[in-house]
Amino acid sequence: CGVQGGYEDLTSELPAADSVSDPRSFTGLSNVSDFKDIEPVADSVEPQLPVELTDADGNDVTVNDVSRILALDIYGTYTKSLTGLGLADNIVGRTVSSTEPNLQDLPVVTEGGHNINVEAVLSLEPTLVIVDHSIGPRDAIDQIRAAGVTTVVMEPQRTIDSVGEDIAKLGGVVGLPEEAKE
């Protein structure tokens, strides 16, 4: 699952880095919008639940319901991956980094950049929160878990080489391990 589009076309529109005398004064393109929408791997998916796992914080978690998901990370990659897995309609809120057109009408549950607003999260009645420590604070994640919301903390370290593995882990969390391989 991933973005379809032409990276080469996008880079031709950007100025060369050395053409700006003071990078802090640079204005203009700040959001690349020419990428095409993410296409799901299937029109309809059937998550295989429950999923039992140990999250990155060492908590044993059982995921029973993926009908109302909040996927929170600094890059917005969790929402993009869930969209690619066919679960876009299950996403009920977003961070400021989740800029996909299909999510723009969803409420933002972070403030001041990437600080989780616990009240905003709980007001959406999520059945599953997927988060990593690229946003926080940690106390906010603990409060969401203490409120009884199934919360899975993922490993925040990502590299270009780990993309496939990261998507596979996320697919495993939501009961779609086979779809995550596509």
Summary of predicted features, one role per range:
Residues 1-77, 178-182:
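Bacterial Sec-exported substrate-binding components of ABC uptake systems
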Residues 45, 62-64, 122-123, 144-146:
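Extracellular/periplasmic catalytic domains that process cell-envelope and extracellular macromolecules
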Residues 47, 85-87, 145-147:
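Short, structurally constrained coil/turn elements
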Residues 49, 104-105, 149:
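A short helix-to-beta-strand connector/capping loop
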Residues 51, 67, 79-83, 119-123, ...:
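Solvent-exposed, polar/charged alpha-helical surfaces in well-ordered, non-transmembrane soluble domains
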Residues 52, 62, 70, 92, ...:
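Soluble periplasmic/extracytoplasmic beta-strand elements of cell-envelope proteins
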Residues 60, 138-182:
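Extracytoplasmic substrate-binding proteins
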Residues 68-124, 128-134:
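A short, structured surface patch at a secondary-structure boundary
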